[in-house]
């Protein structure tokens, strides 16, 4: 029986997953690194070092389909970690790692990463025609109603501006086909959005640089 041919992205993800599994089972790694017994005296920053394996030591993810978590909104991070722990959100890498996080550390991890500076991924701004299409789609769907004017998000709503392009594209499509099921409202909105419009949104949001606007009040 012939094995299915993996796309470049799928092959890269599989290689990363295999590497981590060969080093140690993810659940064991999580248990060792996040156990309050093993690391009771260590600061949360020490425990967070595992996260850099995928999310990057300076906040720049090691792969294009991995999200930025540095500077992400604290409430959003809390909800996603809880959803990974409960199984409401599933991912081959994150699910077993989140399962090993002490429940008492979930809020601390979210607070820690939310206070770090959002990195510039050096993603090019969308061309004018793509930006116009994306802005029209965002207005039609009502994205700014939750993600705010600069797509910076707030509270339990994610920042989208400057997020990894491939992650944005995959996430919106996962909501659309309900592969990701921890936000039914987003699934409904993306189901009503065409793949072409989703592509424009991903390109537009990835290229947004908003720090200058967010810092105006400081």
Regions found by a protein language model. Give the residues of each.
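Bacterial N-terminal signal peptides that target proteins for export
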Residues: 14-26
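Gly/Gly-Pro-rich "capping" loops immediately C-terminal to redox-active cysteine motifs
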Residues: 44, 59-89, 95-100, 139, ...
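Extracytoplasmic/secreted proteins, especially bacterial periplasmic and envelope-associated proteins
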Residues: 50, 76, 93-96, 108, ...
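Inter-heme linker and motif-flanking segments adjacent to c-type heme-binding CXXCH motifs
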Residues: 60-61, 115-129, 149-159, 176-183, ...
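C-terminal capping alpha-helices of c-type cytochrome domains
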Residues: 99-122, 166, 191-218
């Amino acid at each position: 029986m012939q094995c299915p041919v993996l796309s470049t992205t799928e092959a890269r993800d599989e290689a990363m997953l295999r590497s981590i599994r060969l080093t140690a089972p993810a659940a064991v790694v999580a248990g060792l690194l996040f156990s309050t017994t093993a690391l009771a005296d260590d600061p949360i920053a020490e425990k967070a070092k595992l996260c850099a394996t995928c999310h990057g030591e300076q906040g720049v993810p090691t792969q294009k389909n991995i999200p930025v978590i540095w500077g992400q909104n604290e409430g959003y991070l809390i909800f996603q970690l809880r959803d990974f722990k409960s199984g409401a959100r599933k991912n081959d890498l994150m699910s077993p790692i989140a399962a090993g996080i002490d429940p008492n550390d979930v809020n601390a991890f979210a607070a820690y990463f939310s206070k770090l500076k959002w990195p510039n991924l050096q993603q090019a701004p969308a061309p004018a025609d793509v930006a116009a299409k994306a802005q029209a789609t965002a207005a039609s769907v009502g994205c700014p109603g939750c993600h705010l004017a600069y797509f910076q998000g707030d509270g339990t709503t994610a920042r989208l501006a400057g997020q990894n392009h491939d992650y944005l594209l995959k996430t919106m499509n996962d909501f659309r086909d309900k592969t990701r099921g921890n936000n039914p409202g987003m699934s409904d909105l993306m189901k009503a959005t065409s793949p072409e419009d989703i592509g424009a949104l991903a390109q537009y949001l990835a290229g947004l640089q908003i720090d200058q606007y967010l810092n105006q009040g400081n």
